[in-house]
Structures are given as structure tokens and as C-alpha cells.
Amino acid sequence: MAEITNIRPSFDVSPVAAGLIGASVLVVCVSVTVFVWTCCHQQAEKKHKTPPYKFIHMLKGISIYPETLSNKKKIIKVRRDKDGSHRESGRGNLLVNAESGLLSHDRDPRGPSPASCIDQLPIKRDYGEELRSPMTSLTPGESKPTSPSSPEEDVMLGSLTFSVDYNFPKKALVVTIQEAHGLPVMDGQTQGSDPYIKMTILPDKRHRVKTRVLRKTLDPVFDETFTFYGIPYSQLQDLVLHFLVLSFDRFSRDDVIGEVMVPLAGVDPSTGKVQLTRDIIKRNIQKCISRGELQVSLSYQPVAQRMTVVVLKARHLPKMDITGLSGNPYVKVNVYYGRKRIAKKKTHVKKCTLNPIFNESFIYDIPTDLLPDISIEFLVIDFDRTTKNEVVGRLILGAHSVTTSGAEHWREVCESPRKPVAKWHSLSEY
């Protein structure tokens, strides 16, 4: 019988190598498929994508850029035809200036029109405030309207109960803030208040404490004890306890309800704890005849049409509250065209000084023909982290300057181009 032989083809490639080749081919196919799908998807998006200029057009009149991007502010006119209508089918070319955050219009190559009015200037929505003139201030017979959060003088502000004791072994003054009664309503929505108390020992002002906030009550019971070490008993007669009663506000600065001043000259805690109750009175803001002085420097570049304003320093600023604490001043610079504010900037806060040195400069692009209608207002403000900031005084240079020195300073700046002109000015009441 013949022998049967099975003949099988032989492969030079091993099974492992064949598997690797197949995997590589699969990866390449998947990659090509993903790439083709991505390209097609991007093409479809481009066809349905809204041009970016339409988005900016939707936001016209709204500042979409932060003010801190640059210190430059541009003041540019709107181009109009003789008949008063805008060019290009009755509309001006609105542009958004990304550097300064101001709306502007294309410049006319022939130069700005001599006839200008306030509504022709690009004004940010938050720059729509008008310049307050000292000539239009309230007369002594008139009274400012009071807000719901600020109590009037004839409104009872309640009373505060506390106790004073002295720990002789530890040489420590012990003050317990117990409770308050009959506080006024500071929140019109909830018809209540969120009171707390800040206490300072005068005149050294080194010891400052505050209680916790009690929610929605006009008769808070604090019952908190504070111990002040290192105060000799012999010095108690020279100290004054200052209690500042406030109402917490989650969304803005806290409201000041009133204050209590207690000289320890008539208090003798040597025999034990002395409990006292005092009426809360309206906070006494010192009214000073002198508001201090401010030194500023101005320089105008007619070729670049650029005004450089430098806030140099201030001196002899008044203390703004009865506690006599050193102020935390800063300067707010407002630029007005006519009565409309078109730019605003402010310096950094200088802590615990009444003679601050700022040395901060701001640059504004102002066409030469607009200078007669430009005013620059400097507001010196006392910063308070807890309560509302107090305006120490103000200075106006330019078209609405009410002082001889201010008008003279502005005239020198306009008549001496490219030359910085620095002067001291007395601050007036705001």
C-alpha cells in the first residue's frame, strides 16, 4: 500500500509578527478615520459660526474690558455729516477699544468737527455720572434726603449695657459687652438689623476688639468678655472706651448705627464690677475747616494729544472720626467732558498716615480742541474696610475750577505744552 504524504505550505512569517502587523494596520485605519471626521466637523462648524464682530455689536454701549488693563483713556469725537446724521447709512462706526474699555468712533481724516456736544462723546455706562458743582450744593435751609439705612438725628438709636472690672493680680482691664436695646431698623426688607459692636480703648488705640454678629434682632444679647492686659490701674483715669455699634451687610459696607463714648475717669472698678448703661448717639464725624492740601502735576503733549496726570502727595489731612485714628487715604481721579464723567481712576490706599505720598500717574488721550471743556476732579477719600468711605476733600482743575489757583494751574498747563506743572492746592469740602 502506498504511503500518503500530507503536503502543507510553509510560512516564513511567524504568528507573533503577523499579529503585530495586523494591529498596526488597525491603528492606522482608526487614526485616518478620526482625522477625516475631525476635518469634516470643523468645516461644518465654520459654516454655522457667527462672526465675532456681531458679538461685539451686541455688546455696544457696555464695557466688556476691565478698567485695570491700562491707565490710558481715549476721548474721541463722533464723526457726523453736516445734516447731523452719522456717516455710512446714518450710523457711525462703533468700535470697542480693548486697551481702555471705552467705546470710540473712527476719526475723520479731515480732523474733528469744531461743533461738539456732550452726547457726541463715547461714555461708558458706569461713567454717566454728572459733575457736582460747589455752586449747586444745598443751602443751609435745605436738608439731604435720608436713606432708610441712615437714622435721622431725632430717631432713638437705643442703649448699650456693659460692665467694667479690673483684675489686680494680672493688671488687666476686663470689659463685658452685655446687651443692647431698642436698636433702629437698618434693613428695610427684613425690618431688622444684624448688629455687632467694635470697641477701642482711647487714646492709644492699641486695643481693638469686636463682638460676633447677631442676626435679625433689635435687642441683641452679646454677653462677651474681653480682657486687656498690661494696663496699670493708675492709668485708667486717662482712658476712654469707644463702642461703635454697626449692622452687618452681606452685600455692601456695614451700616453705622451709632457710638458710645465712656471716659473711665468717673468709673471706679476697684471694689468690683461696675455695670453701666449708656444711650447710643449718632456717630460724630469731625467737621474741619481745613481739609488738607494735595499736590498734583499735569503735562499735555499736543502732538500725541495726551494728558499726563500725576498724583504726587497730600499733607495735613484731617482725622475723620472722633476716635482720632490715622486715616487710610487714597485719591480718586475723575475726568469730565462738560458735566459728564468719561474716565475714572484711583491710586493705591496709603495705610495709617495723614501725609501720604502717592507718586502715581495716569494718562488720558484728549484732543486739543476739547481741552476748554475738560475738567479733572481729585477726590481724597479715607478708606474704611468696615464702614462707608469718607470723602476728605476735593480739587477741580479745568473748565469747572472754582478756585483761582486751580484756574491758574490749568492755564499754565495749556500754555506750556510738554512741560510738567506741579502745584499744591487746598482741598475744599465735597
Curated annotation (Swiss-Prot):
Residues 1-15 are vesicular. Keywords: Calcium, Cell projection, Cytoplasmic vesicle, Endosome, Golgi apparatus, Lysosome, Membrane, Metal-binding, Phosphoprotein, Repeat, Synapse, Transmembrane, Transmembrane helix, Ubl conjugation. Highly expressed in brain and at lower levels in other tissues. InterPro entries: C2_dom, C2_domain_sf, Synaptotagmin. The modification Phosphoserine is found at S133. Homodimer. Can also form heterodimers. Interacts with PRKN. Interacts (via C2 2 domain) with AGO2 and SND1; the interaction with SND1 is direct. Interacts with KIF1A; the interaction increases in presence of calcium. This is Synaptotagmin-11. The lineage of its organism: Eukaryota, Metazoa, Chordata, Craniata, Vertebrata. The gene is Syt11.
